[in-house]
Amino acid sequence: MNSSRVVFPANFSYEDPLPFECNEDPNVVLSLAMYGMQSSYLIVGAVLNVMIVYTVFHGNSYRDNSFYMLYCADAIVGIYINTAEVIFGRIFIYITPLCPIASPYFFTPSILTKMYYAALHYSLGFKTFSQIFMSFNRMTCVIFLMKHLKLWKQILKPVLIITFILPLGVIWKILLSRVYINPNGAGFSVNYKDYFPWANISILHLFHFTLCFVLVIIFFVATILGLTMLKQRIKSAERSLTIVTMIMAVQTVTFASIQIYFVFFAAYTPKIRSVLLQIVSFVFDSLYVFSPIALIVMSRQLRKDIFNLKDKETQISMYPNSEL
């Protein structure tokens, strides 16, 4: 008889089925409303990122700007993750009537759940590295004013390649381990069983989160100090992209701080842990939802190009092909 939780057999092997019974949902309407709300803002984030990527790659002036190329790499990963969450991850958590219908298909090893779970953790690793490089990009634009363009023409391609490769250092463990589903409320979510106990996925993420936390704060402070020493016309030109980067940095550092807390302090502060468990998914969602909104709101020229707006005002705007 199935239980309402996953039970690992004493001599568990990779191919063993891991069945469970779905929990009863006391409020199906609320669960469906939660899915509707979360899927709505995830779709908005994905659509806005698609519009930004399309605009950047169809405008030479944007492609010449290293920041926009770094952002597009981050946006492409965000589009994939938002889409995967809407059509897979959140569906089976919140559309609870699907649990008894769909869960038996995933009691045995599934390539679908493995791809989803690996991509989810890849995106976490990718986000930390992309935020480091975007923050570094803004710092060099302010600190190394005359050398910024030349520097990024030389390092942009290697940086993009590194950004896509480094997160593989996290997901190799998932690819070799058993990925399974477990009850989550009245639905189910995806988890994994360690194949290498000495290389816990949280520890692998911890290295990236800690590195991101330290470097982003350093770049953030250096950028602010640099802006205070620039002429007003330069500060006006850089303010939009710098503010966007700062918003993204705060989001990423907040998420990294929560993950660091879970590794080191969660066992000692159960009350705080329960609160953070409720908000951590929202913080994760914000990484790929608020960023495109902030970029479109703050970049006047990009907003005009995306929505085909005609500017009849005479005030000076920030053009994308100028990184200075």
Swiss-Prot record:
Where does it localize?
Membrane
User: Per UniProt, what is the membrane topology?
Assistant: Multi-pass membrane protein
Top-level lineage group: Eukaryota
GO annotations under biological process?
A: sensory perception of chemical stimulus
Keyword Transmembrane listed? The answer is yes
What are this entry's molecular-function GO terms? transmembrane signaling receptor activity
Q: What is this protein called?
A: Serpentine receptor class gamma-10
Native organism is Caenorhabditis elegans
Q: What is the lineage of its organism?
A: Eukaryota, Metazoa, Ecdysozoa, Nematoda, Chromadorea
